Amino acid sequence: MERGTSKFSWIGLVARIYNYIPHPSIFSNAILGIAWLFLIFLCCSCLTKSSIFARLLRVKNETTTVDVGFFGVCDQAINSTSRVCHELRNWDQTTGGLAYETSRFAWLQVHPVLLAIVVVFSTLSIVLTILKYLAPAYIRQWSISCLTTSTAACLLLALQMALAHISANSYAVGMNLTGKATAKFGVAAAVFGWISSGFFLLFSLIHLGLWTIERNKQKLFEETSLSFSFITTKLRLIETQYFICKDY
Amino acid sequence: STTSKFQLFSLATNVAQINVGYFNMCVLSANATLICKPQFTGCPGLTSISLTDVRSKFLINEVHPWMIVFSFCVCGVSFLMGVVSSLPLIGRLEFLRNIRISLSFFSFFSILVTALFAHVAVSSFVMAVGNGTQNRVTASLGKKAMIFLWCSMGLVTLTGITDSIILLVTSRTKKIRKTILEKSKVLTPSSSFSSKSSTTKY
């Protein structure tokens, strides 16, 4: 009866799910790699001509079409087929009013510096994953650090995607209402961002399961040590009594 | 006339200024006439932006005014739970305190989301409308409303932190009392053992 009344805990559930994953180390490393790749592709949006698919916002005027990403902006005149791409901060004010305006919006409202911080955390997580194989003596410390950095990357990326979603949608509505231009929110950027954030969360959960199993092993070791120390104390007690009898 | 001072944003033309709040719009004309309505169909000085579209496409879809009503309800329930917990006999119940702390965290989160939505959406909209170079409409952010939103979030955060600290201190005190009781129980076999040994010696 005592076995059936064991308490339910979320960490126990995570550990049980972790036991069902085949090859959890390879699986978690693949998840981290996919999340990092999606993140890098999101950062490179609108920096080159071929990467405007993952744009954040597309603004059309009578004369130009501007695609804005997190760090880049692309400008294309209506009557020409060529497209000019630049970083956000390198865009000159004199070349085009709409491109400069949208670049200023992306830098001031979307806060892509937050995405740069996410890239730092995710790269640190990958470095820690590599260190698990280079220095396996400290695998517990590397795993805990991986859990921390990937959780931070997940939360910061979710915050960044929320900010980008709200601000880009509001900017698009403002552009449409004033009649300056026709603006449309880029769905692919949102999809890439949320997939990346979800995969960082999966990686964190898998490492939480690993950490739980390690803690369970440590608890078992401590209980065994306590049992042996109890036997040792008992032996000392018997020895003391024998000593007292002998003296008398 | 006080409701026109705490607007989310304002649109200014040469003829009039429109203050847009969560549920109300106020038009201040050039001859100092102030008219406040939930919704305006047209404004004499404003021709390029439709106020109906401002309300239906921006306020309802982006700012989400239902969220501030929701936050108000959550904070109201949390405040009522605090009032109920301060009554002499009911305050000792354990689950009321847990409910109050959960509600406090929930109200913090809802006000945070409300303030983020309002600030980010209105800032982006104001930047999109611009400073009147092209269509002679100047948009500006309502700073008083934003300051009020963030101050209320700060106060709710302070309340939540205080409640958490009080709960931690109370539970720690209970643990210390339990430890003292256990120690006083453990001391009894030691005394009996010493009495037994003295009996054996005699």
From Swiss-Prot, chain A:
The chain crosses the membrane at residues 26-46, 110-130, 144-164, 186-206. The lineage of its organism: Eukaryota, Fungi, Dikarya, Ascomycota, Taphrinomycotina. This is Delayed minus-nitrogen induction protein 2. One of its GO terms (biological process) is plasma membrane fusion involved in cytogamy. One of its GO terms (cellular component) is endoplasmic reticulum. Belongs to the SUR7 family. The keyword Cell membrane does not apply. It comes from Schizosaccharomyces pombe (strain 972 / ATCC 24843). The keyword Transmembrane helix applies. Keywords: Membrane, Transmembrane, Transmembrane helix. It comes from the Eukaryota. Coiled coil: none annotated. It is found in: Membrane.
